[in-house]
Amino acid sequence: MVVVQKIQEMKEIAKKLKKEGKSIGFVPTMGYLHEGHLSLVRLSKQQNDITIMSIFVNPIQFGPNEDYDRYPRDFERDKSLAEKEGVDYIFYPSVEEMYPEDFKTVVSVKKITEIMCGKSRPGHFDGVATVVLKLFNIVNPDRAYFGQKDAQQLAVIKQMVKDLNLDVEIVPCPIVREQDGLAMSSRNVYLSEEERKSATVLYRALNLAKEMIEKGQKDVSSIKRAMEEMILKEKYTKIDYIEFVNNDTFEIISKVEGKVLIALAVFVGKARLIDNIVVEAK
């Protein structure tokens, strides 16, 4: 496995691989790898000749009072996990390499970024779209792998790829969960033992919504109320949002019809956790 830190070098490697007729699978991460990331790597290995992972904690997708400085980082640990899974190249650039002083461009996807995480983290998805487009241009992948846990991020990237005619296939991958249902996340390390117990309520609330829908409840506000009640019963919790959107258009709905994405963000202690499920109303 090769670690590459310079953009030019990464571009040259990608060019050479393409010349040799090799397909490239790309797994963009912010590091502090967990089983969710590794499941993306495994799928990439199945579908491509070469797998490239990027590890870059992207400063422009964090707001001024967010956790950029304390976001967990452990490159040596990440390196050994990636190597074990058979990653071929890690692209590990510095902030200066990605954003030199004269950097002036922002990629901004409209409308679908105005709700949910986009609403509570202004500018976040501009930062995501900008870094992902840069990474696509550097790595030139045939396929790129993203977890369904960040459902809105996935929608934003798909939209950008479609609108800008990018030649990369976006492969969504299922959420990987701990045994008690908590979605795997690098931010779970922020949780104390007690908070960790409370954190299972995100998935429980999503399942409560699913059960209500399966029993015929179609009114979003009634389902939301039940979810809120369940979440706020737990210690250390504060709800950022609970949103029901059409799974294809990402438009907010008030009545459950067809395929619905139910997404939430909840603070458990200091950690802001997100989760979602897709439910099909009969």
Swiss-Prot record:
Homodimer. Pathway: Cofactor biosynthesis; (R)-pantothenate biosynthesis; (R)-pantothenate from (R)-pantoate and beta-alanine: step 1/1. The reaction proceeds by a bi uni uni bi ping pong mechanism. NCBIfam families: cyt_tran_rel, panC. Coiled coil: none annotated. One of its GO terms (biological process) is pantothenate biosynthetic process. It catalyses: (R)-pantoate + beta-alanine + ATP = (R)-pantothenate + AMP + diphosphate + H(+). ATP binds at residues 30-37, 147-150, 176, 184-187. Its EC number is 6.3.2.1. GO terms for cellular component: cytosol. Keywords: ATP-binding, Cytoplasm, Ligase, Nucleotide-binding, Pantothenate biosynthesis. It is found in: Cytoplasm. The active site is at H37 (proton donor). This is Pantothenate synthetase. Catalyzes the condensation of pantoate with beta-alanine in an ATP-dependent reaction via a pantoyl-adenylate intermediate. It comes from the Bacteria. One of its GO terms (molecular function) is ATP binding. Gene3D superfamilies: HUPs, Pantoate-beta-alanine ligase, C-terminal domain. Its main location: cytoplasm. Beta-alanine binds at Q61. InterPro entries: Cyt_trans-like (IPR004821), Pantoate_ligase (IPR003721), Pantoate_ligase_C (IPR042176), Rossmann-like_a/b/a_fold (IPR014729). Belongs to the pantothenate synthetase family. (R)-pantoate binds at Q61, Q153.
